[in-house]
């Protein structure tokens, strides 16, 4: 009895000591505030956060949201991150124009795909949607009753990019009504959700298919359909082709750009030294391995952005 009691007390002390050591270790990390495109959530939480805790002694405190919305919050002074990571040049140029940063470095690239739910009644058709002789993917998505999801083009670049992709698809497949039949109006409440909700609804079978970056569905075990380079916004050599389509939002005419991710240290970063070390780390081999693991491509010959 006494031996059992002593063993129990010893185990309790060890457990308490372990918890205390973990708390001390967490307290020893320097906080790093990173605002990043919502589509990067899985990689940032599962790959980057634990890696920089070891490599940079940093505790990444992330804010995931649409890049356009984040850029507007930064410019308004509503948030003050150390580092901002956006997808496509547009949101980063907003921050550059407001003189919140002096330059932005390309760190990765992706492309548009169509993600779909394995629980959907259209899953088997979509799995064959890119094959010769099969029913084309766009015809499947035009089927009445298909539940398609996307994000708000006013706040999230992906929501804008799926409109560009469908417009390019309309030209590529010689189907002038393709975008209207699949998306309906640009702002379609039946299709538009917050970015994390889109993937969650696919997993639950509440949506049949959705827009996505190639980096997203694989991380969640969801199948996806690859699109031709002429329409997927992922090939820098096709930029002139991409720019043949436009979208008008809030009185502004917008053009697509290749899907490159840019990182910038903000001028009023609370931890400027650590932020610059993080930016250097993002361009190194450890980050490259993590990016590749989560299906991000190299930025290739993409150039830095300056004011």
Regions found by a protein language model. Name each.
Residues 25-57, 63, 67-77, 88-89, ...:
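Exported/periplasmic ABC-transporter solute-binding proteins
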Residues 1-4, 211:
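Positively charged n-region of N-terminal signal peptides that target proteins for export
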Residues 81-85, 92-106:
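Short beta-strand-centered segments that line the small-molecule binding cleft or hinge
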Residues 114:
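Serine endopeptidase catalytic core focused on the charge-relay Asp
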Residues 16, 23-26:
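Boundary at the C-terminal end of the N-terminal hydrophobic targeting segment
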Residues 4-18:
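Bacterial N-terminal signal peptides
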């Amino acid at each position: 009895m006494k031996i059992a009691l002593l063993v129990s007390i010893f185990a309790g002390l060890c457990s308490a000591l372990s918890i205390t050591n973990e708390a001390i270790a967490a307290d020893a990390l320097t906080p790093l505030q990173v605002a990043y495109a919502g589509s990067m959530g899985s990689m940032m939480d599962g790959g980057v956060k634990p890696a920089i805790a070891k490599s940079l002694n940093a505790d990444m405190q992330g804010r995931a949201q649409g890049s356009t919305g984040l850029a507007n919050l930064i410019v308004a002074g509503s948030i003050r991150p150390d580092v901002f990571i956006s997808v496509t040049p547009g949101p980063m140029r907003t921050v550059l124009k407001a003189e919140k940063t002096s330059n932005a470095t390309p760190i990765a690239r992706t492309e548009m795909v169509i993600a779909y739910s394995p629980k959907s009644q259209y899953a088997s058709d979509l799995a064959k949607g890119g094959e010769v002789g099969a029913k084309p993917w766009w015809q499947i998505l035009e089927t009445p009753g298909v539940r398609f999801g996307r994000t708000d083009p006013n706040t999230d670049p992906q929501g804008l990019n799926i409109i560009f992709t469908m417009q390019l698809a309309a030209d590529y497949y010689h189907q002038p009504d393709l975008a209207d039949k699949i998306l309906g109006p640009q702002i379609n409440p039946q299709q538009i959700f917050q970015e994390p909700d889109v993937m969650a609804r696919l997993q639950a079978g509440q949506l049949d298919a959705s827009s996505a970056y190639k980096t997203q569905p694989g991380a969640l075990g969801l199948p996806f359909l690859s699109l031709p380079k002429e329409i997927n916004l992922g090939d820098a050599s096709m930029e002139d082709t991409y720019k043949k389509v436009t979208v008008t939002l809030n009185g502004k005419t917008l053009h697509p750009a290749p899907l490159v991710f840019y990182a910038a240290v903000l001028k009023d970063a609370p931890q400027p030294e650590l932020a610059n070390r993080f930016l250097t780390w993002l361009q190194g081999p450890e980050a490259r391995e993590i990016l590749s693991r989560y299906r991000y491509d190299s930025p290739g010959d993409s150039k830095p952005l300056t004011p």
